[in-house]
């Protein structure tokens, strides 16, 4: 028993600190346990939970129990055995020191410095990140989106985007087509889709005239597309309920050489009437009518330049009981001067008059260079002679006389200047030129008076008479006051233009563009309250 106690005492001393290897072995096991438990506590970025390794813990009591079990084995009670046991303990302690020193070096290498991540943890993170990257979660979604985008792009390829604006300069004319007879309302994409099947479009230019008719210039990338459109059947050029009219644009100068201007046609004539009338002498390519409904003019384009002389023979012929005028559009206007040109006043208010009849009368006095029949409210025609003596004779013999039941009033042509002319308004129907001369003779010398129904234009020879004439404003002529204002030719021109445009549109009260709240109940806006004023009180309606 004494020997067993001695062995146990030596074992306890070794564990308590006298024998350092045993104590160091215990501390090493606890240190490894701390490191192995601390490292898993720093979770990775991918997975925050990791299994904690369980390491068996050895205490001093367990080691003592193990040694006691070893001591209980049979042996001799001699001193040799005790020395041998002590030697064995020393050898084991030395081996433990070597083993622990190696472990300490390995542990020193495995110890983490501040801010350092363990290699095993980084490897786990890399493996986890690789697993996450290889996970087929987003790849099918990206493939579907790319497939959907490709399908959308294929659908959009059916109706290409076309630049809307002026056709670029330098575009060959064999790549451009002119489209007319468009419906009043249509979609841009429908028009593009209709012509895109013939070829790739490069530009599209829209036009709208004063009558509201729409037309389009379409430019193709190649001439084959334009040729395909020109050769297409009407069924392939149908937009809505309209069959589009397609032609190739021509040179403006070339068109003018094949075009004649027709005047005095009247406001009720149509394009078909003119086309039928001129096709009696030559093929007609196109007919257009000006928007001025008071004094409209027509432009007839023939198929060939050689047919122009045939069309000019229709000048001064009768169309629907009206004598029309026909001349070249490129005809240079003859310069009118006061020495050679006489103005024939439209006393009879004729809407048309035969130029041949006028020529028969005026050629008695000399060679006539031009007779321009106008048939406006004030002027019937301008007669230009080749010599000034012929104009003087005609003015002296015809002015104020009646020939062939026609009252002639002539005066020399003067450039229209409103510098010394006044406009007299509010005249009665029985007012005459003599009545106005009685009023304005006191102002100054009168050059001319032109009666225009309830209006009159009085022109003075000097500025003094023009200035004094305004003193006669509100004078009484035939029991009615007259009103005087400067005669502005620009004003008359603008008023006529507005009147012509207004007649082609609906009455103002039916125009939606002039009334933004058309058809809506009016909104009575509450007046703003002033600072310090009384609050608004809405009154009851009775």
UniProtKB/Swiss-Prot annotation:
The lineage of its organism: Eukaryota, Metazoa, Ecdysozoa, Arthropoda, Hexapoda. Its capacity to bind DNA and protein(s), and its differential expression during development suggest a role in the regulation of gene expression during Drosophila development. It could, in interaction with other factors, be required for the translation of instructions provided by pattern forming genes and controls, via chromatin changes, the activity of genes critical for the process of morphogenesis of several embryonic territories. The N-terminus is blocked. This is DNA-binding protein modulo. It comes from Drosophila melanogaster. It is found in: Nucleus. One of its GO terms (cellular component) is cytoplasm. Residues 1-166, 505-542 are annotated as: Disordered. Disulfide bonds: none annotated. Residues 136-158 have a biased composition (Basic and acidic residues). Residues 59-114, 123-135 have a biased composition (Acidic residues). GO terms for molecular function: DNA binding; RNA binding; sequence-specific DNA binding.
């Amino acid at each position: 028993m004494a020997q067993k106690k001695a062995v146990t005492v030596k074992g306890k001393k070794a564990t308590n600190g006298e024998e350092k290897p045993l104590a160091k072995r215990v501390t090493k096991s606890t240190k490894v346990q701390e490191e192995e438990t601390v490292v898993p506590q720093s979770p990775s970025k991918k997975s925050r939970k990791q299994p904690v390794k369980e390491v068996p813990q050895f205490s001093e009591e367990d080691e003592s129990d193990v040694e006691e079990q070893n001591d209980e084995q049979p042996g001799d009670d001699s001193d040799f055995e005790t020395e041998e046991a002590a030697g064995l303990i020393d050898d084991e302690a030395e081996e433990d020191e070597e083993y622990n020193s190696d472990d300490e070096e390995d542990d020193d290498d495995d110890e983490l410095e501040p801010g350092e991540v363990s290699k095993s943890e980084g490897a786990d993170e890399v493996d986890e990140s690789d697993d996450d990257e290889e996970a087929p979660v987003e790849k099918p979604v990206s493939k579907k989106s790319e497939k959907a985008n490709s399908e959308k792009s294929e659908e959009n390829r059916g109706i290409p985007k076309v630049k809307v604006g002026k056709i670029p300069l330098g575009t060959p004319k064999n790549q451009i087509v002119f489209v007319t007879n468009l419906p009043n309302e249509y979609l841009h994409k429908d028009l593009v889709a209709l012509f895109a099947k013939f070829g790739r479009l490069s530009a599209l230019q829209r036009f709208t005239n004063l009558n509201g008719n729409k037309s389009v210039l379409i430019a193709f990338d190649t001439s084959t597309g334009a040729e395909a459109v020109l050769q297409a059947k009407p069924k392939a050029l149908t937009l809505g309920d309209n069959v589009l009219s397609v032609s190739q644009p021509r040179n403006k100068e070339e068109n003018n050489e094949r075009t004649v201007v027709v005047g005095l046609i009247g406001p009720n004539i149509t394009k078909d009437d003119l086309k039928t009338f001129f096709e009696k002498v030559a093929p007609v390519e196109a007919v257009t009518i000006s928007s001025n409904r008071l004094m409209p003019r027509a432009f007839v384009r023939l198929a060939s330049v050689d047919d122009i002389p045939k069309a000019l023979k229709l000048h001064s012929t009768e169309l629907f009981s009206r004598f029309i005028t026909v001349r070249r559009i490129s005809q240079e206007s003859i310069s009118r001067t006061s020495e050679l040109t006489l103005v024939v006043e439209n006393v009879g208010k004729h809407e048309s008059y035969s130029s041949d009849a006028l020529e028969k009368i005026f050629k008695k006095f000399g060679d006539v260079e031009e007779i321009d029949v106008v048939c406006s409210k004030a002027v019937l025609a301008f007669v230009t002679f080749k010599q000034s003596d012929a104009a003087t004779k005609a003015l002296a013999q015809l002015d104020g006389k009646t020939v062939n039941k026609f009252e002639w009033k002539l005066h020399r042509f003067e450039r229209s200047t409103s510098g010394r002319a006044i406009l007299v308004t509010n005249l009665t129907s029985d007012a005459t030129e003599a009545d106005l001369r009685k009023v304005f003779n006191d102002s100054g010398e009168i050059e001319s008076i032109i009666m225009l129904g309830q209006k009159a234009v009085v022109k003075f020879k000097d500025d003094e008479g023009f200035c004094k004439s305004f003193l006669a404003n509100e004078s009484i002529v035939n029991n009615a006051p007259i009103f005087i204002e400067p005669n502005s030719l620009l004003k008359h021109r603008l008023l006529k233009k507005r009147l012509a445009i207004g007649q082609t549109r609906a009455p103002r009260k039916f125009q939606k563009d002039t009334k933004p709240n058309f058809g809506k109940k009016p909104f009575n806006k509450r007046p703003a309250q002033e600072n310090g004023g009384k609050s608004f009180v809405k009154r009851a309606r009775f």
